[in-house]
């Protein structure tokens, strides 16, 4: 795909990217616009997250399609409903945050790329631009504790496993009882 939005459109419905024009423009505020050029719906925004949010808005309020975690694919109509009047939406919220330590340690610790890609798509469609990403924190701890003279066994006894990292990072537990 030529842009992340075209890739997102193709994951939603194969061939859908041909029905849209994506335009990225400079702006000091996050915004998206919906417009029409001939038979193509134009989604314009200042970054890819804003544009993805505009796509979600268009699908919901112009096409009647609601994407959700377990249903990130939809069959778009052969001819998309036209945007009759240009519309613009802005936000004054610079950061739109997602996740907390606990949600990251439930099943997310074991997700593969396909599952993460769906989550990243969902976040972009909903305007999320600051997801918690604590990936690799355990590596930092291993490095620091090693430099402080702890043995590998002591470090392994202290650092929690992937499904327990949230509680470990919040100081609620130490180590984990794996075989």
Sequence positions of predicted segments:
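N-terminal-proximal low-complexity accessory segments that begin disordered
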Residues: 2-39
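Feature activates predominantly on carbohydrate-active enzymes
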Residues: 27, 37-179
């Amino acid at each position: 795909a030529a842009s992340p939005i075209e890739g997102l459109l193709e994951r939603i419905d194969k061939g859908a990217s041909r029905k849209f024009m994506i335009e990225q423009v400079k702006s000091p505020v996050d915004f998206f616009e919906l417009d029409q050029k001939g038979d193509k719906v134009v989604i314009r925004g200042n970054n890819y997250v804003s544009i993805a949010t505009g796509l979600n808005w268009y699908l919901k309020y112009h096409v009647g399609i609601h994407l959700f975690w377990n249903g990130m694919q939809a069959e778009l109509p052969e001819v998309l409903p036209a945007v009759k009047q240009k519309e613009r939406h802005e936000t004054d919220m610079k950061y739109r945050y997602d996740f907390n330590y606990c949600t990251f340690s439930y099943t997310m610790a074991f997700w593969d790329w396909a599952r993460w890609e769906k989550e990243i798509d969902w976040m972009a469609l909903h305007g999320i631009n600051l997801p918690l990403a604590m990936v690799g924190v355990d590596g930092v701890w291993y490095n620091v504790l090693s430099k402080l003279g702890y043995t590998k066994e002591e470090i392994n006894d202290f650092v929690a496993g992937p499904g327990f990292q949230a509680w470990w990072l919040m100081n609620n537990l130490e180590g984990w009882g794996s075989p």
